[in-house]
């Protein structure tokens, strides 16, 4: 597409993501068909100027300014392309609020990268944007599927290059994500984890991850059940989520194959066949309701296209 002119607005759609899926700590993530939308345009004036407009109640506490994550990501694009920074405005509509374990920071980073790149004629390749996204976020599990879509396994090779494997997630496996009104910061969730783990726990996770990936590829519910277990992070994070274990148990009792903390939490991910989706959703919401926590639990598919941009239609 042609480079948008100053003042012309573009729309960047970025999927929410669920990371870890139990045993895939910091390396496995999937894009969900629950998109965040960022309408962006270059503005005249101070090159460090960033204006943020939030539509709706989700993310109403977020602020603009040069330290905003969207603008920091945008600056990395311009620096990598050898360009001077420009002023930027972003009008944001979030599908879910931040600090819920659904990749809100990754979404902001990817929106900033994709949007800034588009606004200056796309000088950077998607591979370069991916490299910048991982560097800004510090771990790949959310930003990679947020940019590329689908189910992604990302690891740093011996060469120190990031390697991304696009894994198969068969369409018959659906995701129910219970999203509560409570918040949990990623930093708090990471502080709860020990610095060292027993080698037996690491071995168990490796086996579980293999089973989970095969279950997602084939739709084998038994493999998903056996694979969706974790020893590295979930034992230390479940106690941080009010009612979380009750929500997990309710999902399993309603027919889910497996259940995990979504990202750092507090949202809870359940995998199930489509015909069990409504029952699993209702059970999870009811379990949180018993703890005095409001929630919603949409039945979702995997979003395979990743992030993309287009010129904004005038009346959109």
Swiss-Prot record:
Enzyme type, top EC level: transferase
In short, the EC number is: 2.7.1.39
Query: InterPro entries in the record, alphabetically?
Result: GHMP_kinase_C_dom, GHMP_kinase_C_sf, GHMP_kinase_N_dom, GHMP_knse_ATP-bd_CS, Homoserine_kinase, Ribosomal_Su5_D2-typ_SF, Ribsml_uS5_D2-typ_fold_subgr
Q: Which GO terms describe its biological process?
A: threonine biosynthetic process
Location of this chain's protein in the cell: Cytoplasm
Q: Which GO terms describe its molecular function?
A: ATP binding; homoserine kinase activity
- Which spans are transmembrane here? none
Pathway-wise, it operates in: Amino-acid biosynthesis; L-threonine biosynthesis; L-threonine from L-aspartate: step 4/5
Enumerate the residues binding ATP.
Answer: 97-107
Name the chemical reaction catalysed here: L-homoserine + ATP = O-phospho-L-homoserine + ADP + H(+)
Q: Which GO terms describe its cellular component?
A: cytoplasm
Q: What is its main location?
A: cytoplasm
Keywords for this entry? Amino-acid biosynthesis, ATP-binding, Cytoplasm, Kinase, Nucleotide-binding, Threonine biosynthesis, Transferase
Q: Name one Pfam family in it.
A: GHMP_kinases_C
Q: Which family does it belong to?
A: Belongs to the GHMP kinase family. Homoserine kinase subfamily.
Show the HAMAP family listed in the entry. Homoser_kinase
PANTHER family named among the record's database cross-references: HOMOSERINE KINASE (PTHR20861:SF1), HOMOSERINE/4-DIPHOSPHOCYTIDYL-2-C-METHYL-D-ERYTHRITOL KINASE (PTHR20861)
Write out the function statement from the record: Catalyzes the ATP-dependent phosphorylation of L-homoserine to L-homoserine phosphate.
Name by which UniProt lists this protein: Homoserine kinase
């Amino acid at each position: 597409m042609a480079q948008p002119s100053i003042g012309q607005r573009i729309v960047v759609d970025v999927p929410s993501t669920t990371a870890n899926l139990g045993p895939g700590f910091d390396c496995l993530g999937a894009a969900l068909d629950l998109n965040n939308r960022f309408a962006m345009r270059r503005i005249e004036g101070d090159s460090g100027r960033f204006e943020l407009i939030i539509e709706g109640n989700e993310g109403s506490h977020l602020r603009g300014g040069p330290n905003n994550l969207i603008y920091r990501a945008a600056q990395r694009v311009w620096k990598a392309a050898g360009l001077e920074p420009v002023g930027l405005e972003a009008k944001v509509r979030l599908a879910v609020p931040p600090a819920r374990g659904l990749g809100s920071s990754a979404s902001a980073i990817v929106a900033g990268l994709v949007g800034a790149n588009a606004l200056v004629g796309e000088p950077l390749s998607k591979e370069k944007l991916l490299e910048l996204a991982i560097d800004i976020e510090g771990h790949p599990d959310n930003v990679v599927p947020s940019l590329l879509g689908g189910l992604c396994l990302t690891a740093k090779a011996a060469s120190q290059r990031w390697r991304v494997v696009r894994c198969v997630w068969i369409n018959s496996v659906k995701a129910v994500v219970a999203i509560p009104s409570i918040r949990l910061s990623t930093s708090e969730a990471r502080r709860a984890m020990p610095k060292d783990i027993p080698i037996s726990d690491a071995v168990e996770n490796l086996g579980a991850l293999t089973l989970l990936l095969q279950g997602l590829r084939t739709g084998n519910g038994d493999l998903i059940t056996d694979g969706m277990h974790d020893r590295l992070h979930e034992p230390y994070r479940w106690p941080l989520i009010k009612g979380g274990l009750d929500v997990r148990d309710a999902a399993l009792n309603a027919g889910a194959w497996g259940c995990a903390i979504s990202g750092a939490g507090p949202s809870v991910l359940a995998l199930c066949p489509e015909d069990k989706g409504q029952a699993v959703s209702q059970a999870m919401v009811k379990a949180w309701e018993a703890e005095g926590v409001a929630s919603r639990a949409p039945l979702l598919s995997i979003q395979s296209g990743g992030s993309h941009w287009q010129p904004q239609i005038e009346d959109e």
